[in-house]
């Protein structure tokens, strides 16, 4: 009873404990910021970068592939890694001509066929300005039937294509490498049905994740995934990359949430797997081939996905730890103490916080007293406000008294909670403002997860700054190396070391971002030769002309 009486006198800042001091002695307990405020927005908008508009030719009949390839090679070489130097344009692909454009206009209309240099230029480049293709054509289908006709024609002509959603990826998977035709799914953004009893959403692939989140939340449900880029990314792209995100610790991967898919194969065949059944044991579950295949086996056009119930009680805490071992122990304690209400466990090192404070507008450091080494963001969601609050209070009390938490802040309103999430979600945005950023998305056993950050700092020295952050709850490290410019010298210190080190830990070189172009020829660090060969066989079976998102996912040497 004394604890609950003291709860009315809560302070926002917990403050570090003195030797032998307890939180009970201070009368400090966390504050829950209210069921009514559950649906606060975590989305942050990324200011559009000033991209140079490369002047592409409008005469699509001229075969200037070599010039295009040279231009593309130079951009890739300066941008991200040595991998692009080994990718040559497949000479088996046809070159776009005026007859092709005329055909596409016959099925899409003039508005669905974009040749404007400025618009195509934007679609040719990723949001970080690191990956750039030289496509001269952007197609905007509005139905599965139109996607089918496009692919059937491109397959017969052997025109390579790249499917594109919100273009928020980090590994060059959603932009052309050379002159591939870009197929944007943005016009396919309809919500088809929603089952209010079972929480099953059926929609088209071009739906923006944030729009879907708003829709299902109004129905009393939430999307099973949440990403910093949810205001731009498409659900089709999320599924094609098997995006993980911030709710993975609670709801798992999309392999468990996606119930059905509609996919258009390379030859235009529409594969209808759009079931909404929770159980279906009739033969092979083919949808799993396309979840995470990055558009290399087929283009996802419709999705049926299970959405969890929206829970009324939400708490967000921003904590500091003195060392990484404390972060590990805090995670274990959170799993044991918070159990079923734990919905996010994110960690950041102090370099991330410093970067966020410097480059993100409108944020402030929740713990400005001392420069701690590590920070942890914990979110809980549950159905009983008083029960959830009591569990979080007890957990934080024990964690501070055990020395796992050095300091902490509990969000008391939407603004504070949004600020906490803005810091975590804005790290990627802030990192690109430094100049050059080498991004690695690794899955590593939690006890060894931060070791590679420290080793990378030793290797890089004063050439750059190394950041470590990510989803500690599922062993996903985002390793960022920042520098003022890209250089071969820096790259030599990073690769192949980062892949070799991860492989020795039996980790994955791609936890959630996919392989794309960046890591297609690095797949052997995470997969056996037998597994890669089987993947190659599947690719050749479903896409024998290899027109779907070429140069991505699998090494060119095996195709």
Swiss-Prot record:
Enzyme Commission code: 1.1.99.39
Protein name (Swiss-Prot/TrEMBL): Probable D-2-hydroxyglutarate dehydrogenase, mitochondrial
Catalytic activity as recorded in UniProt: (R)-2-hydroxyglutarate + A = 2-oxoglutarate + AH2
Transit peptide feature range: 1-80
GO terms assigned for molecular function: (R)-2-hydroxyglutarate dehydrogenase activity; 2-hydroxyglutarate dehydrogenase activity; FAD binding
Cofactor: FAD
Subcellular location field: Mitochondrion
Details of cofactor binding: Binds 1 FAD per monomer.
Organism this protein belongs to: Oryza sativa subsp. indica
Keywords: FAD, Flavoprotein, Mitochondrion, Oxidoreductase, Transit peptide
Similarity comment: Belongs to the FAD-binding oxidoreductase/transferase type 4 family.
Gene3D superfamilies with a match to the protein in the record: 3.30.465.10, 3.30.70.2190, 3.30.70.2740, Uridine Diphospho-n-acetylenolpyruvylglucosamine Reductase, domain 2, Vanillyl-alcohol Oxidase, Chain A, domain 4
Domain FAD-binding PCMH-type: 131-310
Entry GO CC: mitochondrion
InterPro entries on file: FAD-bd_oxidored_4_C, FAD-bd_PCMH, FAD-bd_PCMH-like_sf, FAD-bd_PCMH_sub1, FAD-bd_PCMH_sub2, FAD-linked_Oxase-like_C, FAD-oxidored/transferase_4, Oxid_FAD_bind_N
Species lineage: Eukaryota, Viridiplantae, Streptophyta, Embryophyta, Tracheophyta
